[in-house]
Amino acid sequence: DGKEYPSLAEKVFQQASKDAAKSDNAHNLNYILPYINTAINKFPDNIWLQLNKAKLLLALGRNDDALAFGLTVTKSKVNDYWAWELLGDICAANTPDIALSCYCKALLSSNDDKFTGKVRLKLAERMAERGDYSSARGEVERVISYRESEGQRIPEDATRLASQPWYREATASSSN
């Protein structure tokens, strides 16, 4: 059929880096980093290795290093909300205005509440930090409303944001 499939070694590197990126153990994150570098050199077209390296560097607090990989991923997956969310996460510590823009772009890329709850809450957090409480409340309410309608648990971040004094005082904007 003419398709190329990744080698077993490439799949192993990809899965190991994905699992490591979920860890909060700095020793494990630092341990796998040279292996990911080797894998990226060996398989430069594998965007998932670049994604996992960006996540690893972000978990290690190396946001400036993560940015280059995050940009590569976002350029490759420009229409995927999660790529913009990753870029927002990378930018959040040093450039919160850019993070806000990335989260907005993520929601423009996908309006499906099934997938966008986390990014909506991150956007609400940034909006609240800027004093845009009505918009922040609107985002939190949308997440809560969707979760309740689906019979799902309300995320801790939504509960935390909804318990803030600004939330009680704000009137939700109908659209952001």
Residue ranges of model-derived segments:
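Tetratricopeptide repeat
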Residues: 30-33, 40, 67, 74, ...
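Charged, low-complexity interaction regions that mediate assembly/partner binding
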Residues: 146-176
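Helix-turn-helix repeat elements of alpha-solenoid scaffolds
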Residues: 1, 20-34, 55-65, 92-101
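Extended, charge- and Ser/Thr-rich helical segments
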Residues: 2-12, 33, 39-41, 55-72
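TPR/TPR-like (Sel1-like) alpha-helical repeat modules
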Residues: 103-109, 127-152
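Amphipathic alpha-helical repeat scaffolds of TPR domains
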Residues: 1-23, 42-55, 79-89, 117-125, ...
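Short coil turns that delineate tetratricopeptide repeat
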Residues: 44, 77-78, 111-114, 148
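Extended, charged alpha-helical interaction scaffolds
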Residues: 67, 77-86, 100-103
